[in-house]
């Protein structure tokens, strides 16, 4: 689900930052409250999801019955949960750009073409990823559709799909996460050749113990009882998994999966695994994906260990910091303590060593001021600074806070993940709502975030395409001096 990192500790550290900044508690609370009263559009807005849906056109083009099924799914869509589980890339844990991810497929008679209608989530290209917005649209394979203009990959991805993992976005199915993640089951028998390929893949975070069961779900969804499934585990690691599901193996999933097979495939609408045991054969292969285009692909969500499960097992996260639906699924019956309070609440005075004494700086009248100096003294000191004098340590601390505050890294992370209200709240909590920013890294970060939002607006309007030279190549990027070295490679 995430780009490779140098080692397991780096992976844990990276996912901790993602869980802290990518889906803030305020977003979860607002989206959940709106979904609870049936306002699915408002819930999407709260979760940073743009709607490219025209339900009237869907009903007129594909029938009221199909439109009703889509509406039912939208009413139970938990957009904050979807954002929580979206594929991400290192080093910052941002959304993987340029994806079209199928959430659900709908077959109906009279469609124009062989493809079913897909409910899809789209991430913008990398040059327009400011705000980390997600688009929600419909795709039927027979027309371009809304939200596809300027998108690098408008067709649904075979690897990044969630139609077989509804528990990652559908509130009705969220409880299935415990079973599908393998958190409650002991490791099963290991396939032949485990020491050669299985152990290294497991060390990299692959959920090898789950591959056979998840590959069986993929084959069942295509109405097949035997076949080969391609597994992509990292940048250049490929595995072929040969399965024979006749008679169907008893995989003990404990689920009644609602799968929509292709018309005429002969598969049942519900997958019910029978008795027997699979005899899978897994082999490592080389070559690019072009050599395996005819094979079904194991979804990325089934390839890797669930990040939240990995964090819990490592003792790196408290259950209260997880998404409520994730926490209730992975730790049923355990009380949630809620997010931890900030160690330095907004408005609390800070201590500064000033000329041999301990002075305070804090917020007064919406601005950061020196609390232990009288106004006349401060005016004299400010005048001396204008005449190239040395400012008081209290004034130096205030100036430094306006240019390069201690919270700068947290502000940057929030801006990168699109949490502008959270970033501004941190700044206002430190400097006050009436603060005037001075030249420095903090102001640069905020201005850069504003420029990147312009790039996203151009993308949404279909007015910019960097490949055609219609927008500056650096319009959506942070200035070079703020770039950080990569600690990982893309899948």
Q: How should these model regions be labeled?
A:
Residues 1-212, 219-221, 430-490:
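N-terminal membrane-targeting/anchoring modules of bacterial envelope and secretion proteins
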Residues 95-237, 242-264, 268-356:
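Generic structural signal for coil/turn-prone sequence and helix-edge features
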């Amino acid at each position: 689900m995430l780009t490779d990192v140098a080692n397991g500790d780096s992976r844990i550290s990276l996912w901790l930052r993602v869980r802290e900044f990518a889906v803030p508690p305020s977003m979860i609370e607002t989206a959940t409250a709106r979904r609870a009263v049936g306002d699915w559009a408002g819930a999407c807005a709260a979760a940073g999801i743009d709607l490219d849906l025209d339900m009237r056109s869907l009903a007129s083009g594909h029938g009221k019955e199909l439109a009703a099924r889509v509406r039912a799914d939208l009413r139970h869509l938990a957009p904050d949960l979807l954002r929580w589980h979206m594929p991400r890339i290192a080093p910052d844990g941002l959304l993987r750009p340029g994806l079209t991810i199928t959430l659900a497929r709908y077959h109906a008679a009279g469609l124009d073409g062989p493809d079913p209608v897909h409910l899809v989530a789209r991430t913008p290209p990398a040059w327009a990823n400011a705000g980390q917005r997600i688009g929600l649209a419909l795709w039927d394979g027979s027309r371009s559709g809304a939200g596809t203009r300027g998108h690098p990959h408008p067709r649904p991805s075979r690897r990044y799909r969630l139609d077989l993992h509804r528990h990652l976005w559908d509130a009705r199915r969220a409880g299935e996460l415990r079973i599908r993640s393998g958190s409650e089951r002991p490791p099963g028998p290991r396939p032949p050749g485990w020491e050669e390929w299985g152990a290294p893949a497991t060390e990299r975070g692959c959920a090898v113990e789950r591959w056979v069961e998840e590959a069986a779900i993929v084959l069942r969804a295509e109405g097949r009882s035997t076949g080969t499934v391609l597994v992509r585990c990292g940048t250049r690691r490929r595995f072929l998994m040969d399965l024979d599901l006749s008679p169907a193996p008893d995989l003990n999933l404990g689920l009644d999966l609602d799968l929509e097979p292709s018309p005429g495939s002969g598969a049942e609408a519900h997958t019910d695994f029978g008795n027997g045991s699979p005899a899978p054969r897994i082999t490592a292969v080389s070559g690019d994906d072009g050599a395996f285009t005819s094979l079904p692909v194991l979804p990325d969500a089934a390839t890797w260990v669930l990040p939240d499960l990995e964090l819990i097992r490592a003792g790196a996260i408290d259950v209260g910091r997880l998404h409520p639906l994730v926490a209730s699924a992975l730790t049923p019956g355990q009380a949630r303590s809620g997010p931890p309070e900030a160690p330095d609440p907004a408005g609390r005075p800070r201590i500064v060593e000033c000329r041999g004494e301990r002075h305070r700086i804090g917020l007064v009248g919406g601005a950061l001021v020196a609390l232990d100096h009288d106004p006349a003294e401060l005016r004299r000191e400010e005048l001396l600074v204008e005449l190239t004098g040395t400012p008081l340590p209290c004034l130096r601390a205030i100036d430094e806070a306006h240019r390069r505050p201690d919270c700068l890294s947290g502000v940057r992370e929030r801006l990168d993940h699109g949490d502008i209200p959270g970033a501004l709240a941190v700044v206002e909590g430190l400097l006050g709502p009436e603060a005037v920013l001075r030249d420095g890294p903090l102001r640069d970060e905020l201005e850069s975030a504003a420029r990147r939002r312009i790039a996203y607006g151009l993308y949404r309007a279909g007015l910019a395409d960097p490949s055609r030279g219609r927008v500056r190549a650096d319009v959506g990027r942070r200035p070079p001096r703020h770039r950080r070295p990569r600690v990982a490679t893309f899948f």
